[in-house]
Amino acid sequence: MEFLGQIDRKSIDWAFRASDLHNYYATKLIITKPGPLPNAGLVRFIVLDGRERERVELPLPLTLERGVDYRVKVSVHGSRFLTSVNGQLVSSWTDNRLSRGGVGFFSEDGESALVKWVSLSERDSFLGRIVSHFSLISFPTAGGGQN
């Protein structure tokens, strides 16, 4: 999954390998200290049977600001998960408890974000690898154009 988004308040949050609202992996890019020299972090956790488990917060080697576009890429290879922001790898971890599911975006109290576009690709099959090179899901922006 790859997307372009902006943080409006606090963070931008997404889920992957979501089989339902009670079982998924979650990741957040968060502004930990707003202001002229903001600090940023990445939070990741798993939700199993509706209960959040193993929340990890890591500092990011970059700054995040409100209203700035960030290109986020999430690569899933078996039980290995890689996250990059603007082409820079910021997280790598493994977990094998959830093997399949969808993707989505969410926000918790006090958080909001804008997602400008999302690109999804399936690479588990030969056809999926071919199609993924030509696929892009575009959503209209507030100005009526397509990104």
Residue spans for each PLM region:
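Activation corresponds to long, low-complexity, non-globular regions
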Residues: 127-147
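Short, solvent-exposed beta-strand-to-loop segments that form ligand-recognition rims
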Residues: 82-109, 132
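Secretory/extracellular carbohydrate-interaction modules
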Residues: 1-49
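Short, aromatic/His-centered strand-loop micro-motif at the edge of beta-sheets
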Residues: 49-73
